A protein has these predicted regions:
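Short, small-residue-biased leader/transition segments that mark boundaries at the very start
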Residues: 1-6
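The feature identifies polytopic integral membrane transport proteins across all domains of life
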Residues: 26-32, 54-65, 71-74, 82-90, ...
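Membrane-embedded alpha-helical segments of transport systems
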Residues: 36-44, 63-72, 83-102, 131-133, ...
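Transmembrane helical segments that form the transport core of multi-pass membrane transport proteins
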Residues: 138-223
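C-terminal transmembrane helix pair
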Residues: 218-300
Length: 300
């Protein structure tokens, strides 16, 4: 079991090596949207508990709302959930369905006028030293706030440090391609062993899929409502759709938000703002996973 968890953590090195935190560092306010868009996780945990799942299983199911397949699998493995296979299928299925789910969720809580809001993009310059220091600082801060998250965030940030240091290009390329692809393949094979028909084709699986969908929808709605709340206090309004990009499905969610903005009004470019929020969601989802592990472990 320990080796399985280790394999999953290695995948975060590959993910970290793929991420450019530049759009986020040039607009630090986007950190808030990544945090706000994790609301669905905790809402789904409550729903799963009310539906009769054990706390460890409910916590694992709720993490589907992180819109992050590796985090969902890792948390369910650490919590020793009985539904690892169903959770993995739900997490990756809904990640693929982001272009269908998110527009529906966004339109539920926004008006056409809000979706047409233009945002100026004037990023601050981000130095190489800042990009190198960022993963180190994040790991230290997360370690102080939520030590249980370091196992996840540390690997993610280590991968990003390999990318940004500028002297380990071959390692960076390997992490982004060979390592990520190999671990993904091994991950799929490992999960498949827990997906026997008698253990997978059950009513519980349908319930998990349903709760996962609720988590995804409420993630998007939570981010949008947070953006609308912020707009009450600022002069230069934020397009509320940016809040929905705070989930971890990178870069799919940012593309969906930009596509919707263009459909509402041609020439409305909010892609870089959406990417900043989307990158923030990558960090926030991993931290949320660590927090859930810590909080639930205290009651088991």
């Amino acid at each position: 079991a320990a080796s399985d968890v280790y394999k999953r953590q290695l995948l975060f090195i590959g993910i970290g090596a793929m991420i450019d935190f530049g759009p986020l560092l040039s607009q630090p306010v986007m950190f808030l949207f990544g945090a706000a868009a994790q609301f669905g996780i905790f809402f789904a945990i409550c729903v799963a508990t009310l539906m009769g799942f054990d706390l460890k299983d409910a916590a694992s199911i709720g993490i589907i709302g992180a819109a992050d397949g590796p985090t969902s699998i890792l948390v369910s493995q650490i919590m020793r959930s009985d539904y690892v296979g169903a959770i993995a299928v739900a997490a990756y299925s809904y990640m693929a369905l982001v272009p269908i789910i998110q527009p529906f969720a966004i339109r539920l809580v926004t008006t056409k006028k809000e979706r047409q809001i233009h945002m100026t993009y004037s990023p601050k310059a981000v130095s190489r030293s800042t990009k190198i220091a960022f993963p180190i600082i994040v790991t230290i801060i997360v370690g102080l706030i939520s030590p249980a998250s370091v196992a996840l965030v540390g690997f993610l940030m280590f991968g990003n440090l390999i990318r940004e240091c500028g002297v380990l290009q071959s390692l960076s390329d390997t992490a982004q391609n060979e390592l990520a692809n190999l671990i993904t393949l091994l991950l799929g094979i490992t999960i498949s062993f827990s997906m026997r028909a008698d253990a997978f084709v059950r009513v519980d699986t349908l319930m998990i899929m349903g709760i996962g969908l609720v988590a995804f929808i409420f993630d998007s709605i939570g981010g949008v409502l947070f953006a609308k709340f912020i707009n009450l206090f600022i002069k230069n309004k934020i397009n509320p759709m940016i809040g929905a990009a705070g989930i971890s499905a990178f870069p799919m969610s940012a593309r969906v938000v930009q596509k919707m903005a263009s459909e509402e009004e041609k020439g409305n470019i909010i892609l870089m703002h959406a990417v900043g929020a989307n990158v923030s969601g990558q960090i926030a989802s991993v931290i949320a996973g660590g927090l859930v592990i810590k909080l639930v472990s205290q009651y088991l």
